[in-house]
Amino acid sequence: MWPTFKGEEWDKGMDQFAEQHFMVLDQFLPPSVLETVCRYFASVEAEDRLKAAAIGPGKERTRISEIRSDFVHWLDRPLMTELETFFDGMDAIRAAIAESLFLSLRGYEFHLAKYPKGAFYKPHFDQFNSRENRMISVVIYLNENWEPEHGGALKLHKPQEILIEPAMNRMVMFRSDTV
C-alpha cells in the first residue's frame, strides 16, 4: 500500500467506514501517482476518448441522459502500462480494505469521468439491483483549482445527507448498496 495511508489515519477512516458506510481521505494518491493519472486523463481528453456514460450492467448498459450526463473512459489494466503504479497501489488498498472490513473483495473496475458544466448523475445506488458483486465504490477527484461556485459536490444520502466537495486528490469511499 502507498505509505500515505498506513497507521492511525487509515485506521480512523476504516472505523468511520464501518460505522457510517463512507469515509473521506485527502491527499490520497502519492504525488508521482497523482501526476501520472492526471497526465493520462489529459491525454484521454485531448484524444477525445471520453464516451457518453451509460447505466446498467454489461449488455443491459444503456444511455439515459435524464439520469446521467457525464462522460467516461474505462481503464483496462493490461492495455494501460503507464498506470501500473496506480493499479498496484489500488491492489494493495483493496487487500487492506478487505482485511480491515472482513470482506471478500476479488476484483475491481475503474473509469475516468468528466462532468462538464451542468452535467449530473441523479441519486442512485452504485450496486445494480440484479447483481451484488459491487460492494464498495471509490471516487478520487482530479479537479485542479476547484472552487465551490464550480459545483459538483458529491451528495451522500445515507445515513444522513452529506455534501463532499470534489477537491483535488480527495478520495471518497462508500458502500455501493446503502449510500
At which residue positions do the language-model features occur?
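Fe(II)/2-oxoglutarate oxygenase catalytic core
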Residues: 1-137, 141-171, 177-179
